[in-house]
Amino acid sequence: MEIVALLAVGVALGLALGLFGGGGGILAVPLLLAIGVPTDEAATTSLVVVGVGAIGGLIPNARVGRVAWREGITFGALGIAGAILGSQAALLAPEWLKLWGFALLLVVSGTLMLRRALAPPVAAEDRERRSWLLVALVALAVGLVTGFFGVGGGFLIVPALTLVMGMAVHRATATALLVIIINSTAALLPRAGEALDPKVAAIVAITTLITGNLAARWSNKWSSRALGIGFGSLVLAMSLLIAWEALNAG
């Protein structure tokens, strides 16, 4: 695999994570597929890269007290079983199913991002949490998505933390990074020794981490609305690429 291509993926993913937060990790798999990485390896590598990127983003947020540790650990722990089951299912699923499923996931997530960007601003304060049963079910579903598709799931975690756990948006965005770390680690367990090139993962992860830290400093130069519209549109465009891959896979 060409190092230049891997560096390009790391830079692109770092920009996405730095500018758009944890939700940017959804681009990892499409970008890796675009340079010829097989589907299972792309998903496993994505879990490593997004997990490392989340650690890099969590540290500065923790320093300013933005992370809700108890809620994040609880939500992440409730999703561990789903992440493990999702990974095991992905290793058994046919190529075409994973690709079409991921294309659909991109369409749904891109649409949600656009709707969120175009919606009126939500209240900044924490709200009342819903029932623990609902929290557990949502966390399990997020874990399944993380494990099966190899994505961090930030685009699902942030709305889940705000709507289900009643968390303010800025706290949910920071806390989602903690959940991503937990879910990604759990999802990697069934994939241990399977479909992973350590050199590829290391190059992309390090490049992503460096670029992401730099890009995060630029994010305040654009409005949340502009970033949301731009990223949602990009995710929808990437769904076409994955759909094309799925057609070629039969």
Give the residues covered by each predicted segment.
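Hydrophobic alpha-helical transmembrane segments of multi-pass integral membrane proteins
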Residues: 111, 174-188
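Juxtamembrane transmembrane-helix boundary motif
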Residues: 1-15, 29-35, 39, 59-148, ...
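Transmembrane alpha-helices of multi-pass small-molecule transport proteins
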Residues: 45-60
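Transmembrane helix boundary and interhelical junction motifs in multipass membrane proteins
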Residues: 20-28, 150-160
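Juxtamembrane/transmembrane-helix interface segments of polytopic membrane transporters
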Residues: 29, 90, 154, 158, ...
